[in-house]
């Protein structure tokens, strides 16, 4: 009995040893499998990470080339959308804007003559720390020219100051704006237009008035409104018709008088001619032509309208120095309806 018990014990011990050995082998196999797989996985992950790092590596030149085709609006939209994704981009944009003088420098105009740098600093220092302040001074008088510049250290200070563009400085109301916007546009008053004058030098542009500004006077080339203090014409007036275009000498004679066409000459042209007695008259300055032109200047009119008479503007008057036909017919010189002349 004792022998059989010993044998059974030996068998149990052998079985337990074998099971323990099998367990150890299984554990070793399980430990060896991840060890064999880890080198492969680590190498693959390291290669992937190196590729991703090489793709995402920041290259300023490449980024500039990528952004070059975009317009300004597209770039602004791109930065705004990127700022929503990452706050770091927004903070970078704000930081760059704070460093830029464009958003921090203010132009102040409408200052009193007594304004000094200390006066301007006292007005704007409540909005933020001031980095620089300048009042432009006239060297001749030593007084302010009426404008100056204030530059804040931060963009926030300039933004706060511009919330109220009108500032009361001493006894005047000044206005401020960003200096990057340029000088303020000067207000244009309702000035009355100067005398209108016609240029007869370019009659080829008939019907196409071209307005020019010459020494404060409005000049119309070609057709347009006549420039006589006694008559206002238009582009359909016979003055600009065949009478002027058909005879260059006529246009030259009219231009010699400064372009002023009085009713007598305009009426003559409107009715198709100018009498020969008018052409040879000694009072050529009275019909809108410079007296210096003389008979030589209007000789072309006589040859062009010879044989045609000038319609009388005042039927009861005689402009040729004859006696009037009114009740006071004995009055000498020119008279109208019997009233003697003032000479």
UniProtKB/Swiss-Prot annotation:
Keywords associated with the record: Nucleus, RNA-binding
Record has Phosphoprotein as a keyword: no
MF term (GO), any: identical protein binding
Biased composition (Basic and acidic residues): 319-330
Every RRM domain range: 104-181
Biased composition annotated in UniProt, kind: Acidic residues: 50-61
Domain of life: Eukaryota
GO cellular component term of the entry, any: nucleus
Biased composition (Low complexity): 28-49
Compartments, as annotated in UniProt: Nucleus
Region annotation Disordered: where it falls in the sequence: 1-61, 312-343
Cited InterPro entries: Nucleotide-bd_a/b_plait_sf, RBD_domain_sf, RNA-binding_reg, RRM_dom
UniProt function note: Acts as a component of a complex regulating the turnover of mRNAs in the nucleus. Binds with high affinity to RNA molecules that contain U-rich sequences in 3'-UTRs. May function in complex with UBP1 and contribute to the stabilization of mRNAs in the nucleus. However, unlike UBP1, UBA1A does not stimulate pre-mRNA splicing.
Assembly notes: Interacts with UBA1A, UBA2A, UBP1A, UBP1B and UBP1C.
Protein's name according to its UniProt entry: UBP1-associated proteins 1A
Organism in which the protein naturally occurs: Arabidopsis thaliana (Mouse-ear cress)
Lineage: Eukaryota, Viridiplantae, Streptophyta, Embryophyta, Tracheophyta
